[in-house]
Amino acid sequence: PGVSIHTGATGAMHTLLVTTQGELYAAGSNEFGQCGLGALATCVPFQLVPMTERVVDVACGRAASVVVTESGAVYTMGSSEDGMLGTCAASWHHTGPSDVTYDLARHPVRIPNLDGIVRVTCGERHVAALDRDGYMYVWGHASLARLGCGTQSDQPFPVRIPQFVRKNKQDRIRDVVAGTTCTMCVDNQERLWIAGTWRLKAVSYTHLRAHETSLH
């Protein structure tokens, strides 16, 4: 009672909510530590996730979560599979002849050298983030060219998209969203840029490129 929600996000089986006071709450499956509560038990009802500063944005992937704080710092928790945590390459150990278990971050871990972030979005297996200057960063699973950084190799650390590093702020990014197998963003001239595969098309853009769709 008395808690007002500012924003939230859902993954495959978990949910994060941010209050207007900047507190972070989590609920749902915590099998991979994606709720950031330490233990891996299912989290029901919502529980407060301890953070050292106010939270302003969140995003959820299939087995990982991303949190942005008021200062622009980014924290991740959950499975290291696909490099989703942005802090290390996917690391695992064998638990059987054909079974692999990926290392987990059970509490929020800050991504080093990534500052000034104001917006974050997750696909099922990749992440895109936007900083206050309009620069865009991506990391995680790269198949089908969904990252838009010119490679289909997974990126375990944030990569800045070079084509938006421009002096003219009108050519920088205003908003970004990650889909299951694509990433889309809008620049300050209201142009739509797309990378990856979408609408079940067999075409993939390895770099973010302007699309003919009008936003007006």
Where is each model-derived feature located?
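Eukaryote-biased RCC1-like beta-propeller repeat architecture
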Residues: 1-209
